[in-house]
Amino acid sequence: MNSSLILANFTSPAVLCFLIGVIAALVKSDLRVPPQVHETLSMYLLFAIGLKGGVALSYSNLAEIFYPALATLSLGVITPLLAFGLARRIGRLDSLNAAALAAHYGSVSAVTFMAALNFAHQAAIAHEGFMTALLAVLEIPGIVVALMIAGFLGGTKTIRLRQVVHEAITGKSVILLTGGLMVGLLADRGGLAAISNVFVSPFQGVLAFFLLEMGVVAASR
Protein backbone atom coordinates (compact mmCIF):
# COMPACT_ATOMS: atom_id res chain seq x y z
CA MET A 1 0.00 0.00 0.00
CA ASN A 2 1.61 3.28 -1.09
CA SER A 3 1.54 6.59 0.76
CA SER A 4 -0.83 8.23 -1.71
CA LEU A 5 -3.42 5.52 -1.06
CA ILE A 6 -3.09 5.97 2.71
CA LEU A 7 -3.41 9.75 2.33
CA ALA A 8 -6.47 9.33 0.12
CA ASN A 9 -8.06 7.16 2.81
CA PHE A 10 -7.41 9.64 5.61
CA THR A 11 -8.66 12.55 3.51
CA SER A 12 -11.83 10.80 2.38
CA PRO A 13 -15.05 12.56 3.49
CA ALA A 14 -16.12 9.62 5.65
CA VAL A 15 -12.87 9.52 7.66
CA LEU A 16 -12.76 13.31 7.97
CA CYS A 17 -16.31 13.33 9.31
CA PHE A 18 -15.31 10.70 11.87
CA LEU A 19 -12.36 12.87 12.96
CA ILE A 20 -14.64 15.90 13.28
CA GLY A 21 -16.86 13.87 15.58
CA VAL A 22 -13.85 12.85 17.68
CA ILE A 23 -12.68 16.46 17.96
CA ALA A 24 -16.19 17.62 18.87
CA ALA A 25 -16.31 15.13 21.75
CA LEU A 26 -12.81 16.02 22.97
CA VAL A 27 -13.61 19.75 23.14
CA LYS A 28 -16.86 18.98 24.99
CA SER A 29 -19.10 20.20 22.18
CA ASP A 30 -22.84 19.64 22.46
CA LEU A 31 -22.83 18.09 18.98
CA ARG A 32 -25.14 15.09 19.04
CA VAL A 33 -27.20 13.28 16.45
CA PRO A 34 -30.66 12.48 17.88
CA PRO A 35 -31.01 8.76 18.69
CA GLN A 36 -33.91 8.37 16.25
CA VAL A 37 -31.83 9.82 13.40
CA HIS A 38 -28.85 7.64 14.31
CA GLU A 39 -31.09 4.57 14.30
CA THR A 40 -32.57 5.52 10.93
CA LEU A 41 -29.14 6.07 9.37
CA SER A 42 -27.93 2.73 10.71
CA MET A 43 -30.95 0.91 9.26
CA TYR A 44 -30.55 2.67 5.92
CA LEU A 45 -26.87 1.75 5.61
CA LEU A 46 -27.43 -1.90 6.51
CA PHE A 47 -30.25 -2.28 4.00
CA ALA A 48 -28.33 -0.42 1.28
CA ILE A 49 -25.29 -2.65 1.78
CA GLY A 50 -27.49 -5.75 1.61
CA LEU A 51 -29.16 -4.44 -1.53
CA LYS A 52 -25.83 -3.84 -3.25
CA GLY A 53 -24.60 -7.28 -2.22
CA GLY A 54 -27.77 -8.92 -3.51
CA VAL A 55 -27.32 -7.35 -6.93
CA ALA A 56 -23.73 -8.60 -7.06
CA LEU A 57 -24.89 -12.00 -5.81
CA SER A 58 -27.29 -12.29 -8.73
CA TYR A 59 -24.29 -12.36 -11.06
CA SER A 60 -22.47 -15.07 -9.07
CA ASN A 61 -22.94 -18.84 -9.06
CA LEU A 62 -23.19 -21.22 -6.12
CA ALA A 63 -19.74 -22.73 -6.68
CA GLU A 64 -18.10 -19.32 -6.20
CA ILE A 65 -19.85 -18.73 -2.89
CA PHE A 66 -19.87 -22.18 -1.27
CA TYR A 67 -16.29 -22.43 0.03
CA PRO A 68 -16.01 -18.78 1.18
CA ALA A 69 -19.34 -19.20 3.00
CA LEU A 70 -18.15 -22.44 4.62
CA ALA A 71 -14.90 -20.80 5.75
CA THR A 72 -16.83 -17.81 7.10
CA LEU A 73 -19.21 -20.08 9.02
CA SER A 74 -16.27 -21.98 10.52
CA LEU A 75 -14.58 -18.76 11.62
CA GLY A 76 -17.87 -17.62 13.13
CA VAL A 77 -17.88 -20.71 15.37
CA ILE A 78 -14.16 -20.96 16.18
CA THR A 79 -13.52 -17.28 16.93
CA PRO A 80 -15.97 -16.91 19.86
CA LEU A 81 -14.74 -20.18 21.38
CA LEU A 82 -11.14 -18.93 21.29
CA ALA A 83 -12.19 -15.49 22.55
CA PHE A 84 -14.10 -17.05 25.44
CA GLY A 85 -11.13 -19.19 26.47
CA LEU A 86 -8.73 -16.24 26.35
CA ALA A 87 -11.13 -13.99 28.24
CA ARG A 88 -11.45 -16.59 31.00
CA ARG A 89 -7.77 -17.50 31.27
CA ILE A 90 -5.99 -14.24 30.53
CA GLY A 91 -8.69 -11.66 31.20
CA ARG A 92 -9.94 -13.48 34.31
CA LEU A 93 -13.52 -12.62 33.41
CA ASP A 94 -16.50 -14.54 34.74
CA SER A 95 -18.42 -16.82 32.39
CA LEU A 96 -21.16 -14.36 31.44
CA ASN A 97 -18.83 -11.43 30.73
CA ALA A 98 -16.43 -13.70 28.85
CA ALA A 99 -19.34 -14.96 26.72
CA ALA A 100 -20.47 -11.39 26.02
CA LEU A 101 -16.94 -10.49 24.91
CA ALA A 102 -16.79 -13.65 22.79
CA ALA A 103 -20.00 -12.62 21.03
CA HIS A 104 -18.43 -9.30 20.03
CA TYR A 105 -15.36 -11.01 18.63
CA GLY A 106 -17.36 -13.75 16.93
CA SER A 107 -19.81 -11.34 15.36
CA VAL A 108 -18.86 -8.54 13.00
CA SER A 109 -19.03 -4.75 13.06
CA ALA A 110 -21.23 -3.62 10.20
CA VAL A 111 -19.79 -0.11 10.56
CA THR A 112 -16.23 -1.42 10.15
CA PHE A 113 -17.38 -3.47 7.18
CA MET A 114 -18.98 -0.43 5.58
CA ALA A 115 -15.83 1.65 6.08
CA ALA A 116 -13.62 -1.13 4.66
CA LEU A 117 -15.93 -1.61 1.67
CA ASN A 118 -15.94 2.13 1.06
CA PHE A 119 -12.13 2.23 1.17
CA ALA A 120 -11.84 -0.71 -1.22
CA HIS A 121 -14.23 0.99 -3.62
CA GLN A 122 -12.39 4.32 -3.53
CA ALA A 123 -9.00 2.61 -3.92
CA ALA A 124 -10.31 0.56 -6.87
CA ILE A 125 -9.42 -2.67 -5.05
CA ALA A 126 -11.19 -5.61 -6.68
CA HIS A 127 -13.38 -7.63 -4.31
CA GLU A 128 -16.17 -10.17 -4.68
CA GLY A 129 -19.66 -8.75 -4.74
CA PHE A 130 -20.99 -11.49 -2.46
CA MET A 131 -18.94 -10.25 0.52
CA THR A 132 -22.12 -8.72 1.97
CA ALA A 133 -23.69 -12.18 2.03
CA LEU A 134 -20.73 -13.39 4.08
CA LEU A 135 -21.28 -10.48 6.47
CA ALA A 136 -24.78 -11.82 7.18
CA VAL A 137 -23.40 -15.36 7.56
CA LEU A 138 -20.76 -14.22 10.05
CA GLU A 139 -23.29 -12.30 12.12
CA ILE A 140 -25.23 -15.39 13.23
CA PRO A 141 -22.89 -18.19 14.51
CA GLY A 142 -20.87 -15.96 16.83
CA ILE A 143 -24.01 -14.82 18.65
CA VAL A 144 -25.44 -18.34 18.80
CA VAL A 145 -22.23 -19.84 20.22
CA ALA A 146 -21.84 -17.06 22.79
CA LEU A 147 -25.46 -17.34 23.94
CA MET A 148 -25.10 -21.10 24.31
CA ILE A 149 -21.90 -20.66 26.36
CA ALA A 150 -23.60 -18.09 28.57
CA GLY A 151 -26.61 -20.35 29.00
CA PHE A 152 -24.74 -23.52 29.89
CA LEU A 153 -22.06 -21.94 32.08
CA GLY A 154 -24.24 -19.21 33.51
CA GLY A 155 -26.59 -21.63 35.17
CA THR A 156 -29.32 -21.79 32.52
CA LYS A 157 -29.00 -25.47 31.74
CA THR A 158 -32.35 -25.66 29.96
CA ILE A 159 -31.37 -23.25 27.22
CA ARG A 160 -33.07 -24.12 23.93
CA LEU A 161 -31.08 -24.06 20.73
CA ARG A 162 -34.18 -23.06 18.76
CA GLN A 163 -34.68 -20.01 20.97
CA VAL A 164 -31.03 -18.99 20.67
CA VAL A 165 -31.05 -19.33 16.88
CA HIS A 166 -34.33 -17.39 16.69
CA GLU A 167 -32.85 -14.50 18.69
CA ALA A 168 -29.78 -14.45 16.46
CA ILE A 169 -31.49 -14.55 13.07
CA THR A 170 -34.26 -12.10 13.97
CA GLY A 171 -31.86 -9.37 15.08
CA LYS A 172 -32.28 -6.03 13.33
CA SER A 173 -28.94 -6.07 11.54
CA VAL A 174 -29.43 -9.61 10.20
CA ILE A 175 -32.98 -8.87 9.00
CA LEU A 176 -31.89 -5.68 7.22
CA LEU A 177 -28.82 -7.26 5.63
CA THR A 178 -30.57 -10.43 4.47
CA GLY A 179 -33.67 -8.48 3.46
CA GLY A 180 -31.58 -6.15 1.32
CA LEU A 181 -29.77 -9.15 -0.14
CA MET A 182 -33.03 -10.80 -1.15
CA VAL A 183 -34.38 -7.62 -2.72
CA GLY A 184 -31.17 -7.09 -4.69
CA LEU A 185 -31.09 -10.75 -5.71
CA LEU A 186 -34.72 -11.16 -6.78
CA ALA A 187 -35.90 -7.73 -7.95
CA ASP A 188 -35.96 -6.92 -11.65
CA ARG A 189 -33.41 -4.45 -12.98
CA GLY A 190 -36.04 -1.83 -13.79
CA GLY A 191 -37.31 -1.83 -10.23
CA LEU A 192 -33.80 -1.57 -8.82
CA ALA A 193 -33.01 1.35 -11.11
CA ALA A 194 -36.10 3.13 -9.77
CA ILE A 195 -34.81 3.02 -6.17
CA SER A 196 -31.14 3.62 -6.95
CA ASN A 197 -31.56 7.35 -6.29
CA VAL A 198 -32.41 6.48 -2.69
CA PHE A 199 -30.18 3.51 -1.90
CA VAL A 200 -27.17 3.98 -4.21
CA SER A 201 -26.43 7.62 -4.99
CA PRO A 202 -26.83 9.05 -1.43
CA PHE A 203 -24.92 6.16 0.23
CA GLN A 204 -21.54 7.91 0.53
CA GLY A 205 -23.08 11.05 2.03
CA VAL A 206 -25.17 9.11 4.54
CA LEU A 207 -22.13 7.03 5.54
CA ALA A 208 -20.08 10.20 6.11
CA PHE A 209 -22.78 11.73 8.32
CA PHE A 210 -23.20 8.46 10.21
CA LEU A 211 -19.46 8.33 10.91
CA LEU A 212 -19.64 11.87 12.28
CA GLU A 213 -21.85 10.57 15.06
CA MET A 214 -19.68 7.46 15.47
CA GLY A 215 -16.68 9.73 16.03
CA VAL A 216 -18.53 11.51 18.83
CA VAL A 217 -19.53 8.19 20.40
CA ALA A 218 -16.05 6.67 20.10
CA ALA A 219 -14.31 9.65 21.70
CA SER A 220 -16.92 9.90 24.46
CA ARG A 221 -16.32 6.30 25.50
Regions from the PLM with identified roles:
Residues L45-L62:
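Active-site-flanking structural segment that lines cofactor/substrate pockets
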Residues E39-S42, A48, F84:
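Metallocofactor- and cofactor-centric catalytic cores in central/energy metabolism, strongly enriched
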Residues L26-K28, R32, K52, A193:
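Residue-level signal for pocket-adjacent positions within structured domains
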Residues S29-L31, P35, V55, G91, ...:
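Juxtamembrane membrane-water interface segments of multi-pass membrane proteins
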Residues G50-V55, L81-L86, M214-S220:
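Short, functional N-terminal and low-complexity linear motifs
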Residues M1-A24, P35, L62-P202, V206-M214:
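Alpha-helical transmembrane segments of multi-pass small-molecule/ion transporters
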